[in-house]
Amino acid sequence: MAGGSDGSENLDNQDFAQNRRAQYRHTMSNHLEQLTAEWLEYRGYFVRQSVLVGKRDTGGFAGELDIVALNPTTRHLVHIECSLDTDPWSKREARFTAKFERGRTYVPSLFAGLDLPAKVDQVALLQFGGGTRETLGGGRLIWVPDFVADMLSVLRKSRPDKAAIPSTLPLLRTLQLAAHFSQPRGRTGCIIEQPEGATIA
């Protein structure tokens, strides 16, 4: 419904813009979750993603865990929550504390019957922010740039022509190509030709 002259149109536009930003953050967060899940699978983990936990008798669930993964060889059990938020630290602390408390309650039941460690390693994976903080909500804090750098340092050791990442891990396979072929090899490789001195819009 169109807004009126009383300013409701501006409010409608603001709501629309806020919804679009929220949808964008959700989509990008899902992308980060998928990349993280692919990395863990590549490194030998059993991975569960977007896991609903705490089913209520009245319907619904207590919440959702982004990624839970277990390495059967090392017995490393990890719960990762990904976020692209730009919230103040106080709000982040409260939110991740609740997420990780939920994880400690429900993660062990996701791998019932398996030999699990006594403690769940919990990680907050954030893209935006900075400082010297190393923990959040009771879990370890890892920044996306550091996470990507770690992946690239490993992927540079496996050549695409000799040890290609499986096509079932498309995001990680793209990173492997970028790790080995990031330097331009001449204009013959340009799909879209750019005039000399031109900048990409």
Residue ranges and their predicted role:
Residues 6-201:
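Intrinsically disordered, low-complexity Ser/Thr/Pro/Gly-rich regulatory segments
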